[in-house]
């Protein structure tokens, strides 16, 4: 499974003094993408967080976006909302949050 693979990889990378981070799966607009469910995303994120060893730092962008807001109306797709891709503003917000967590 995914967590086992990451845990195995972490042992090799921490032996080389690497700092390890993982970012949660982000929310989607289920009104536009009904095949994806928020409960499944939350479940995956929770299982991964519980199963990963202590070598990882979690960047919980899912909770950040749920708290601060996001939009999946994408400029690159003619301002359409496919439920999966974000606006440029949201992508920049995710990037800034991740950099802040890493530093």
Predicted regions, residues:
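Catalytic His-Asp segment of secreted/periplasmic serine-dependent ester chemistry enzymes
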Residues: 26-103
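A short helix->loop->beta-strand "cap" motif at the edges of active sites that frequently abuts
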Residues: 15-20
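Surface-exposed amphipathic alpha-helices with a cationic face
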Residues: 7-14
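Glycine-rich anion/phosphate-binding loops
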Residues: 1-6
């Amino acid at each position: 499974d995914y967590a086992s693979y990451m845990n195995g990889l972490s042992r090799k990378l921490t032996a080389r003094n690497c700092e390890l981070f993982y970012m949660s799966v982000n929310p989607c607009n289920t009104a536009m993408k009904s095949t994806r469910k928020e409960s499944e995303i939350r479940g995956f994120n929770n299982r991964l967080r519980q199963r990963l060893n202590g070598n990882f730092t979690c960047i919980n962008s899912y909770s950040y976006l749920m708290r601060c807001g996001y939009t999946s109306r994408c400029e690159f797709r003619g301002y359409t909302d496919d439920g999966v891709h974000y606006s440029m503003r949201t992508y920049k917000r995710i990037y800034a949050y991740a950099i802040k967590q890493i530093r």
